[in-house]
Amino acid sequence: MKENAYEMPWRTNYEAMAAAGWLVGATGAIAAEMLSELPPEPFWWMTGISSGMALYRLPEAYRLYKLQKGLKGKPLAFMELSHLQKVMAKHPDELWLGYGFEWDQRHAQRAYEILKRDKQTLLNQGHGKQMGSTWIHGVEPKEEDVYLPVGHTEGHTLIVGTTGAGKTRCFDAMITQAILRNEAVIIIDPKGDKELKDNAQRACIAAGSPERFVYFHPGFPEHSVRLNPLRNFNRGTEIASRIAALIPSETGADPFKAFGQMALNNIVQGLLLTSQRPDLKTLRRFLEGGPEGLVVKAVTAWGEQVYPNFSVEIKRFTEKANTLAKQAMAMLLFYYERIQPVAANTDLEGLLSMFEHDRTHYSKMVASLMPVLNMLTSSELGPLLSPIANDVDDSRLITDSGRIINNAQVAYIGLDSLTDAMVGSAIGSLLLSDLTAVAGDRYNYGVENRPVNIFIDEAAEVVNDPFIQLLNKGRGDRKSTRLNS
């Protein structure tokens, strides 16, 4: 279309009417010549002129017909995986998005002309009245493959649309291409779309590495891998912050939430002091049952590091302690009398202060924290989210965000939010926080920094503060995030 050309494509197709009229004239001339005794030459001339005018009008009539027909929607396009592999081979540095066109001035003008008319006379009259604004594809009858440079996806991608509009199928195409590029892929799916999972697994098989696919779903624990959402962290305080973020709170300065976070941090620091890796079940055990056992181990670990003859002198304090609580109290006294003047440890003192706290008041203050830990460690979720590496009775694979990324695995993580929205949201938030910690490691240490693709369906259900940080800073460690909403 020329810059100054005038186009009104949504009007009545007068060219088709004119072509039909000229064809009728040509047919009439032929019939008259056959049925009359008049000289044939004038009829031949009439037939030729009418046919020529009809042929002159037909191309524009057909162009308008195709353009107007496109407004009524197009059938769904399907592509074989083998064909997609051929497309990727021709465009190795580009992401195939689908079929479309480059929007320019003529498309803007056509859209403007549609929007100022009564659209119901033009739109959604074919292909079963598909949902959405299918006419947008119709403003250009000649669609072609649309590509995006892979490097541009590091700026993250947001896909929006109503239910059933095709957001998840768009994910399918992006996920398949990321898998075929041998990149790490993490799919977080709150609703548990079986077709999305099957397509990801099928792509791994097509790539020749079916072992890369790992599956996590609380609703199918027997088929699920075990996944530790607290495995990756840079500082112990991160773990307390992750779990405390799950505590329901109506105000920004909730004392119950603050106390719960402090209690979590004290337990975490005690575990790290004894060279134990925190997990959800361990945290619940010490918060619910009391920190006495951890106090004994933590004071012992610190005393052996900094206090000479610790193993000899501690016996005088613990010789009459015949219960765990009395042993913990003896350890507390030994720390304050002997160790603190020599080598104080603020992390250990936080744990000791928690041990000294009034038990009744403590139970009330962590009342909002315990339901969160209970639901994440109960029944089948316990072994799933707090795996024990040396458990000989459980042969399920153990993985975490760091392993998924470093081994270029394809992790489908179903949250089963339709069954239990609260648990699904909590698991999703913990996993996103774990991914943020991995991003921090990649920034600090540059662990190969292979591309990582994170796909989050129904993102509003799992987004938290650490994930927003990941969006802001994830490009530097080659994390590409795609959100559906």
List each language-model region with its residue ranges:
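Conserved small/polar residues in nucleotide/adenosyl-binding loops
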Residues: 481-484
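P-loop NTPase motor domains
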Residues: 140-142, 150-155, 160-163, 168-479
